[in-house]
Amino acid sequence: MGKKINPILFRLKKNTVYHSLWYTFKKNFCYYLKCDILIREIIRRNFLFINLSYIDIIISNKLTINLYINNVDQFNIIENYLDVFVFQISKILKKNVILNFVFNHVLNAKNIAYNVVNQILNKNSIKKIIKEELLKNRKNFGCKIQISGRLEGVDIARKEWSLIGRIPLHTIKYNLEYYQCETLTQYGILGVKIWLFKKNNEK
């Protein structure tokens, strides 16, 4: 069971939190779900060049959006585009928008995936990429990186993965992060999956 289900979904009520929080009636659930997906798509499209760790969307009488970034320099890049972005978002729900930036310096699974994808696009060796990223994250209890597809242009798709430490997929109480993404190369699409076993007090 633990190996089939998404590790974040498996631990949602135990030690993880929802990144979408809506204060509304049950009949408006479908409408707010569509708005939530649309807002996240606009955020990704506008801030494509920035590595956002998390996106929190809180809908009440106002719309509150918390963007978690890892570097203060990233905020300086997007500072000039914030007015246009807030205007686009306010037209969707017709609510006042509160935009908060949270500087999150703790490395998470999405940051690792972002680094792996950048190195793949730079045409580095797959085994070298995995080895370097695992060595960077050896302070955690465990880290597993898997890359699948036509690796380095081979004719038959395969998986390349490596693990340092341990990844307890079946134990719900542990703080386990998971992230998956895809990247387009000249040989096709490569899938990247990251499992990260962190200390319980880290977010």
UniProtKB/Swiss-Prot annotation:
One of its GO terms (biological process) is translation. The keyword Coiled coil does not apply. Part of the 30S ribosomal subunit. Forms a tight complex with proteins S10 and S14. GO terms for molecular function: mRNA binding; structural constituent of ribosome. SUPFAM superfamilies: Prokaryotic type KH domain (KH-domain type II), Ribosomal protein S3 C-terminal domain. The keyword Transmembrane helix does not apply. Belongs to the universal ribosomal protein uS3 family. NCBIfam families: rpsC_bact. One of its GO terms (cellular component) is cytosolic small ribosomal subunit. InterPro entries: KH_sf_prok-type, Ribosomal_S3_C_sf, Ribosomal_uS3_bac-typ, Ribosomal_uS3_C, Ribosomal_uS3_CS. Keywords: Ribonucleoprotein, Ribosomal protein. Disulfide bonds: none annotated. This is Small ribosomal subunit protein uS3. Binds the lower part of the 30S subunit head. Binds mRNA in the 70S ribosome, positioning it for translation. It comes from the Bacteria. It comes from Carsonella ruddii (strain PV). Pfam families: Ribosomal_S3_C.
